[in-house]
Amino acid sequence: MSIEDRLKEKVGEIIEDLEVLVGYSHSGLPLKVNPVFIKDKNKIDSLIFNKFCINNLATYAYSLAKEVKGNIGIVLKPCDTRSIIQLLSEELFDRNKIKLIAVGCSGVLDYKKIQKQLEGQKIISSEAISNDLKVKTIDNEYSLKIKDFYADKCYWCNIYDNPPLYDEFIENEQKLEVEPGKKYADLQSLESQDLEEISKYWDGQFEHCIRCYACRNVCPLEICKEKCITHLEIPHWQSQRIDSNEGRFFQLIRVLHLAGRCTECGECERVCPKNIPLSKLMKKSAQITERLFEYRAGEDFKKRPPFLTFKDIEKNIKEEKLV
């Protein structure tokens, strides 16, 4: 029985206990899938699970928990369960209200990498077959090696078949082919440069930010969208100018608000229309948090995030003597 059939079978067993279930469905577009909201058995057949399911459906958890009176089911990849764990650690919804259906993952494909490889050609169909991705454009057909086009997070994933939290787990017979690489390799390359070059690099990135708020809206941990500083008029924090200063202000505020909370799902970078490498910022924040507080977001929902706790003495932070 295929992974999709087993998923449908499991959902069929529990759907009566749920008011709504969020899963993946065909989008009608190559390389992409859509979220689907299922309320009865008639729509279960629309569920899919494949290498194009890159979206983190945990982004719907908080809003649905507020809006829906009954129980909620969410189909998640093992890495996505970290976002749920983090939300629970901040006591943002009742654990008993959420049914987590974790599906073992064999890696998901980054469609931006594929589009870059094909130099922007219009893709009209795509299909993952064994270790190959068959892509058809208007003029040509291509066979690409799947292992070369995984999302960056897949290369250092160590929980793809071992979700840290779930109610139902559907094991995937296909395993992730690549060995976890060096998680911080891109940061090390950037940080090997001098401070002036690093500053110049980020200025060049931030000036492209058009503040479409896609990064904020897709993030499962950015739950204060209706109270975001970008929408406040009194006080007025953010102007509508498009330049490196305003882009820097918005993105660094995001980093601060997500410090010790980001589970590094990469959704912010995935949806950015300007391809700003936002994951680098978030990984750096996570790296510092782990070093100072020995804490990794999304690992244990019983452990409070460092910025929601207070200690008289932090063993990894030395106080500066004031002269």
Segments predicted by a language model, with ranges:
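Iron-sulfur-associated redox domains of electron-transfer enzymes in respiratory
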Residues: M1-K200
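Short gly/pro-enriched beta-turn/loop segments at secondary-structure junctions
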Residues: F149, K200-G204, I210-A214
